[in-house]
Every structure is written in C-alpha cells, then in structure tokens.
Amino acid sequence: MVEADRPGKLFIGGLNTETNEKALEAVFGKYGRIVEILLMKDRETNKSRGFAFVTFESPADAKDVARDMNGKSLDGKAIKVEQATKPSFESGRRGPPPPPRSRGPPRGLRGGSGGTRGPPSRGGYMDDGGYSMNFNMSSSRGPLPVKRGPPPRSGGPPPKRSTPSGPVRSSSGMGGRMPVSRGRDSYGGPPRREPLPSRRDVYLSPRDDGYSTKDSYSSRDYLSSRDTRDYAPPPRDYTYRDYSHSSSRDDYPSRGYGDRDGYGRDREYSDHPSGGSYRDSYESYGNSCSAPPTRGPPPSYGGSSRYDDYSSSRDGYGGSRDSYSSSRSDLYSSDRDRVGRQERGLPPSMERGYPPPRDFYSSSSRGAPRGGGRGGSRSDRGGGQKQI
C-alpha cells in the first residue's frame, strides 16, 4: 500500500514550528547535495506545520540521513526522518507518512460521504425549501409534509390528493395553523403555478374533486382536518394572498373579508360561501385530481358527519370560525350536497360549486366573486338541504 516517493526524498516530521528551510538546509546539507526542501506551511497563517520534505540528489545520501537523523533533536524537538511516501506528502501532519495517509483517505471518505449525505438532504431541503419558499415557510414547519405534497404536485393532480392528506396530517401533526396553511400553500402554491391559467377550470372541476378528494383527505385525516380548522385559516391566508394576491384580497375586503387579518381570523369571512368556494378551490388545488377522488371519497365520507368534520375543516379553510356554526351548517349542507352529488355524480357539485370559484377567481377584483362564491355555496347549501 505504501509507495515510496521518488528516491532520495525524505520525510522529516516533528519539526519545531520555528524551524525554517534554512535551518533544515544547514542540518541536512552536510550529508549531501539537496535538490529540494519543502517545508509544509499553513495556508492561512503561513506557519510551519511541523513537517517537511527534503530531497537529496543521491538516494544513498538520503538513506544515510534517515539512519543518522531519525529520532535526533532539532531546535529542541525530536524529529522523525524516513523515506517519504506519496500519501504522506498530502496529509502527513502527524509525521509518519503512513498515518497521515490513512488519515487523509478517511477524511476524503468522510467528506465524500458527508457530501453525499449533504446533497441528498440538501436536495430534500431544496424541495422543501423550494416549496417552502413558495408556501411561505411551509418547509420550515413541516418540511416533510411539504415534501410529500410537492412531489405529488409535480407528479400530477392525483398526487395532489395525497399531498392534501400529507398537508392535513402535517397540520394536525404540526399542531399549528400555519403548518397546515403552509402545507396547503405548498399545494395551493404549486398548483397555482401549474394551473394558474386554468385555475378557474381547475376550480370548477376540481371543486367536486376537491370535495371528494378533500373528503378523502378529510376521511383519512378527519382529525387532522378538524385540526385544520385551526390551521385552515392560515392556509386561507396563503391561498387568498397567493391565489389572487391583490385581487382576491381586494375581493375579500369588499366581501367583508375586509381584514387580511381576517385571513388569519377567517372568522370574519362572513361570506363563508365564498370561503367555501375558496376551500373548494383549495381542494381543487389540492386535488386537481378531480373526478377520481370524488369517487373514492364519497364512500369514505359515507356519513355526513365526516362531511361535518370536513366542512369544519373547510370552515377552517374558509377561516370563518366565528361563523362556523352558520357557515358550517351551510358548509355541511353544501358538503352533504356535494357528497350527495359525488355519490350521484360530479356534475351536480360541479354546477353549483364550480361557478362560485370561477367568479371568485375571475372577478375577484370586481367583487363579483362575492356573489359568485356565496351563490355557489348557497346553491350548495340549498342542494344540501334538499338532500338532507
């Protein structure tokens, strides 16, 4: 393993840090002609690292020096003199070439392994980060959930379903509204980007899906969805802000969402319906998956109670906690309607639910969304009542 460096090259270790090239030349020059003296110095401080390489013109002279000078004292320190080995040159702080060499490779390995580890984690973080960036800190609180979400997103709408479930869990697990919102944001955020042009469309069709998918999510994470109520408001904030940033916010104010804080509060969103539609859009975002999710979820929802939970979570999304009771009832009814629709088929919910989101998004700045959102939710409510 240990390969001797070129003949005549000696490794001198254990040097006093004050020993310089001239001192080495004075000591070793007595044995023969020296071709090169390489004193290893610290790059930053430029101080001696305690070892050097002295190359003699004649290998025989080098052997004599190694025999005579090894273990001798130089400038108050016992030095080690031996045939230089290639590895020792690179990492020979200790002195003996072999030890440094062994040391060096491990370092490299560590570095490599660390690097490999680092990059992957970084990659993950990147994903999270990227998402988080989009989601506004979603990564920081729930990077993992976010991760789950984003990949599905990129994967496609169906994955989004999984994403919502992930986020919901994350929110519940996180125990913080923000996480959920972020997780959702992450979902909402990327979906926004992807569907931006077709947001409305997405909302229209995804709504039903969103319900169903969300239902599926909620069914999976009903608890979390309930938790999401708390978290939900923040998601809304994000969605509001993110979705329509200026326009949606404006709409909200006009609607009575007035308070962006209201986003945080979401309670003041008396226009739960619109909130619902947003939620729907949320859901649609989360589940761009549309119809398929609806199929699965209705059975799982099976009971209106889930919807209630769901609706409550939606309320969370809607964020109108204050109007939970009223909005919930509306939402419940609407949810039930949707459930019924889903059970019957997506079209009903699509008709009722989709238009409101469209209005919101398309005319969020106008304030028409209010009416649209409310109307949509109302229709849902009406539908829900009929079903009930």
UniProtKB/Swiss-Prot annotation:
Cellular location(s): Nucleus
Feature: compositional bias, Basic and acidic residues: 61-80, 191-212, 238-271, 333-344, 377-388
Entry-annotated residues carrying Phosphoserine: 88
Segment forming the signal sequence: none
Stretches for region Disordered: 61-388
This protein's UniProt keywords: Isopeptide bond, mRNA processing, mRNA splicing, Nucleus, Phosphoprotein, Ribonucleoprotein, RNA-binding, Ubl conjugation
Feature: compositional bias, Pro residues: 148-161
GO MF, one annotated term: RNA binding
Keyword Ribonucleoprotein belongs to the record: yes
Cross-link (Glycyl lysine isopeptide (Lys-Gly) (interchain with G-Cter in SUMO2)): 80
PROSITE patterns to which the protein is assigned, alphabetical: RRM
Domain RRM: 8-86
Keyword Transmembrane helix in record: no
Gene Ontology CC entries for this record: spliceosomal complex
One GO BP annotation of this record: RNA splicing
UniProt biased composition (Low complexity): 320-332
Pfam family, one: RRM_1
SUPFAM superfamilies in alphabetical order: RNA-binding domain, RBD (SSF54928)
Function: RNA-binding protein which may be involved in pre-mRNA splicing.
PANTHER family named among the record's database cross-references: TRANSFORMER-2 SEX-DETERMINING PROTEIN-RELATED (PTHR48034)
Protein name listed in UniProt: RNA binding motif protein, X-linked-like-1
Organism: Rattus norvegicus (Rat)
Lineage: Eukaryota, Metazoa, Chordata, Craniata, Vertebrata
Gene name as annotated: Rbmxl1
